[in-house]
UniProtKB/Swiss-Prot annotation:
Residues 160-176, 230-242 have a biased composition (Polar residues). Residues 265-277 have a biased composition (Basic and acidic residues). It comes from Caenorhabditis elegans. Residues 147-159, 185-224, 243-254 have a biased composition (Low complexity). Residues 1-25, 136-277 are annotated as: Disordered. This is Glutamine/asparagine-rich protein mdt-30. The gene is mdt-30. Interacts with mdt-28.
């Protein structure tokens, strides 16, 4: 007899269910319900250290035969507590017993008296299930967490109030319990668009204000430029800068050369404001005209360079526009013409323009004059002395005038010339002293000293110690 074959079954193949008994003999062994009198398999020693695990850890449960896991006599296989098996439709997880009438209920009858205690047995587990699975199946479930409403549902449940504070003649406020999602979304989008438009308008107003301030500053600078003569730019040198005695001097020379040789990317424009030139004196108009001449020289040179690039079909740099530059040159010429007309109108009616012959006659010395002079030359010489008495006359044309640099000038103007010469000498001496100080600083700078070799010093110390 096979040891895995239950003793209360007739002998046969252990992998196949036994045939149905001919007599009303029902087995005492039900599937999944081992009886206490069935002998268990012998216990074998378990591997491990001496002493071994606790007794309950080494218990081996006898496995059921293969045929007991399948359908037997039309019953479903296994109890509901077996891991990996679907729950059974029978009460308590076991199939109905054999020999019972078909109309009799298979489960325990329900308790009729609610006051009676519950004597129902706990759920049975399959012998092969682990202790953890049995504990988890018998443990109570944790309480369910409270369900929180979503943020969207809370927003939809809030009442929406429409206020008419901006319109005093409107009807009183109305409270609506809920508003559709698309209406709320549209209102939010409209508010965002309105805020964006207001921000753009504020930025545009700020830009306009800054532009007006810049234009006003340029106009004021142009109006003040009349009293300040412009500085004439030094033409670029073709040679290399002279060698200096220090690295800083060479660096300054290189920076100066780079500034002189690089093209002028920003051209100073003439004032575009239509100012009234009549209110300025003749001297101020002359200074303004000199500034326009210097500006025109730079712009015409730059314009010729751009036109050459255009003719050679070379790409222009950013900001190079020959049309704008030509318009600026044209405006400068027109302004110079206006200044010339104003100065000409202020001259005396008897004034005549000096010709080339008149200028040569004025520059001649007495030793260069042919004597005796003819009548025509004497008449011409007398006319020039009358017109340019401050240059040709041997005596002061006005009492108190002083001869200075080939012409007669007033005493006040002579004092100003003297003060200017004194200040010029002071500035020259100060510039020379500053240059000498800079040269001393460059020469005596410790950065130009030779570096000390530490290895030689350490070697010398060791030699001295030895």
């Amino acid at each position: 007899m096979n040891p895995n074959q239950p003793p209360n079954y007739p002998p046969g193949n252990p992998n196949q269910p036994p045939p149905f008994p001919p007599t009303p003999y029902y087995p005492m062994y039900q599937a999944g319900m081992p009886m206490p009198y069935i002998p268990q398999s012998p216990q074998y020693p378990q591997p491990g250290p001496p002493g071994g695990p606790p007794p309950f850890m080494g218990i081996q449960i006898k496995q059921e035969p293969m045929w007991s896991q399948e359908n037997r006599y039309g019953m479903q296989a296994g109890p509901s507590g077996m891991p990996g098996m679907p729950p059974s439709s029978h009460p308590y997880g076991y199939p109905p017993m054999h020999g019972m009438p078909p109309g009799m209920p298979q489960g325990m009858p329900p308790m009729m008296d609610p006051n009676m205690p519950d004597f129902s047995s706990p759920p049975m587990h399959h012998p092969t299930t682990s202790l953890l699975a049995q504990h988890l199946s018998s443990a109570p479930l944790p309480p369910a967490p409270p369900q929180q409403q979503s943020h969207l549902s809370q927003l939809l449940q809030q009442p929406t109030t429409y206020s008419t504070a901006t319109n005093p003649h409107a009807a009183p406020t109305q409270t609506i319990a809920r508003r559709p999602d698309n209406e709320a979304r549209n209102a939010q989008l409209q508010e965002q668009e309105l805020a964006a438009r207001q921000q753009q308008q504020q930025e545009y107003m700020l830009q306009q204000h800054q532009q007006q301030q810049q234009n006003r500053a340029g106009q004021l600078q142009a109006e003040q430029a009349f009293a300040n003569p412009p500085t004439v730019s030094i033409p670029p040198q073709t040679g290399h800068p002279p060698q200096q005695t220090s690295a800083s001097s060479q660096q300054r020379a290189q920076e100066t050369m780079a500034q002189q040789t690089e093209p002028q990317s920003h051209i100073r424009e003439s004032p575009q404001k239509e100012t009234n030139l009549e209110k300025y004196s003749t001297g101020e108009l002359c200074l303004y005209g000199r500034e326009l001449v210097n500006d025109l020289n730079v712009k015409t040179s730059y314009l010729s360079t751009i036109l050459k690039k255009v003719m050679e079909r070379k790409p222009l740099n950013q900001g190079e526009n020959p049309n704008d530059l030509a318009d600026q040159c044209k405006n400068a010429l027109q302004r110079m013409s206006d200044i010339r007309q104003i100065i000409e109108k202020r001259r005396e009616p008897t004034w005549k323009r000096m010709t080339g012959e008149d200028y040569i006659e004025l520059m001649l010395d007495d030793s260069e004059l042919k004597k005796p002079m003819d009548e025509e030359r004497q008449k011409r010489r007398a006319e020039l002395e009358q017109r340019f008495a401050i240059v040709i006359s041997k005596t002061p044309p006005v009492e108190g005038h002083i001869w200075y640099q080939g012409k007669w000038i007033s005493e006040e103007l002579h004092k100003k010339y003297m003060q200017f010469e004194a200040n010029k000498e002071i500035v020259k001496n100060l510039a020379a002293e500053l240059k000498a100080l800079a040269w001393k600083i460059d020469v005596t700078s410790p950065g130009h000293l030779k570096k000390v070799d530490q290895t030689k010093i350490s070697k010398k110390k060791t030699d001295d110690q030895v």
